[in-house]
């Protein structure tokens, strides 16, 4: 079994309040969840209105599938013009590592 996690550090564009931040982040999180059927949540910078960290995780029997899904999530987030992807921190674990 393979487990992949990824933290995507994101700078939000023209956002001036936490309410505006939610209107950008929630649809993005929902789109990731819908397209890839994986666990996803806002996991960092929750109190800053122009930054967020989105965390995703995927489990599969195949390491290549885990890598493909996390790469696709990164491309999806990077393709949104209202956000700028600052950094991506993927991690891969085998059940034998745990």
What are these regions (language model features)?
Residues 6-10, 54-56, 88-90:
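A structural signal for short, well-ordered beta-strand segments
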Residues 12-14, 60, 94:
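Non-catalytic surface loops within mature trypsin-like serine protease
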Residues 12, 42-44, 92:
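Short, well-ordered turn and helix-capping elements at secondary-structure junctions
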Residues 3, 41-62:
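Short, charge-patterned binding micro-sites
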Residues 1-39:
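N-terminal first-folded block
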């Amino acid at each position: 079994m393979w487990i992949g996690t990824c933290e995507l550090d994101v700078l939000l564009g023209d956002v001036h309040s936490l309410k505006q931040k939610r209107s950008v982040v929630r649809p993005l999180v929902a789109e990731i969840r819908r397209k890839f059927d994986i666990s996803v949540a806002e996991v960092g910078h929750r109190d800053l209105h122009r930054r967020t960290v989105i965390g995703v995780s995927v489990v599969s029997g195949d390491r290549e599938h885990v890598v493909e899904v996390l790469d696709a999530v990164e491309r999806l987030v990077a393709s949104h013009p209202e956000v700028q992807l600052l950094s991506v921190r993927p991690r891969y674990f085998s059940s034998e590592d745990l």
